[in-house]
C-alpha cells in the first residue's frame, strides 16, 4: 500500500472490493480525514463491507464504471483496480466460474442480473457469441470458439 497511499488525508477508490482485503489495508494507512470509496457488484462483497464500521469508508454496490457518478474530477489521490474473478468466487461451485468444480454455468458477478452464461450459450446465435468473445474477451479465435459452442 506504500506505493498507493501518497496522501493519508486523500480520497481513494477500491474499484474491486471483493472480500475487502485491499480496502482494509488502505483504511489502515489513512488518517481519520482520509476517505475510501469501494465498489463491487457482488452480494457477498456487500455483506463483507458491512463489517467495516469506519466513518471514512463507503461501499457502493455498482460497477466501477460508474465512478463519475460518485467522485468529482481531480479529487482522487489514488485508485486500486484488481480485475478478474476473486478466489472466493472460484471456490463457490454455485457461482459457475471455475472449471475445476461442478456447478451451474452461471458466471454472473452481479447475482441479481437475470442473464446467465447458460442462457447466452443456449439462446444466442453463433455471431452474437463470437462478438461477445471478441469484444469483451479480446479473443482472437472468437469465431472458431463460437462455432464449437453452437
What are these regions (language model features)?
Residues 1-150:
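S-adenosyl-L-methionine-dependent methyltransferase catalytic core, i.e., the SAM/SAH-binding region
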Amino acid at each position: 500500500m506504500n506505493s498507493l497511499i501518497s496522501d493519508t488525508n486523500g480520497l481513494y477508490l477500491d474499484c474491486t472490493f471483493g472480500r475487502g482485503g485491499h480496502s482494509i489495508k488502505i483504511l489502515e494507512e489513512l488518517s481519520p480525514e482520509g476517505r475510501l470509496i469501494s465498489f463491487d457488484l457482488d452480494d457477498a462483497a456487500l455483506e463483507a463491507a458491512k463489517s467495516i464500521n469506519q466513518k471514512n469508508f463507503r461501499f457502493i454496490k455498482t460497477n466501477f464504471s460508474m465512478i463519475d457518478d460518485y467522485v468529482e474530477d481531480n479529487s482522487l489521490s489514488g485508485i486500486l483496480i484488481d480485475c478478474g474473478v476473486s478466489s472466493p468466487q472460484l471456490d463457490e461451485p454455485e457461482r459457475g466460474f471455475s472449471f475445476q468444480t461442478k456447478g451451474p454455468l452461471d458466471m454472473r458477478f452481479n447475482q441479481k442480473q437475470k442473464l446467465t452464461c447458460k442462457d447466452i450459450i443456449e439462446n444466442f446465435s453463433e455471431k452474437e457469441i463470437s462478438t461477445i468473445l471478441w469484444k469483451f474477451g479480446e479473443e482472437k479465435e472468437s469465431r472458431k470458439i463460437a462455432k464449437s459452442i453452437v
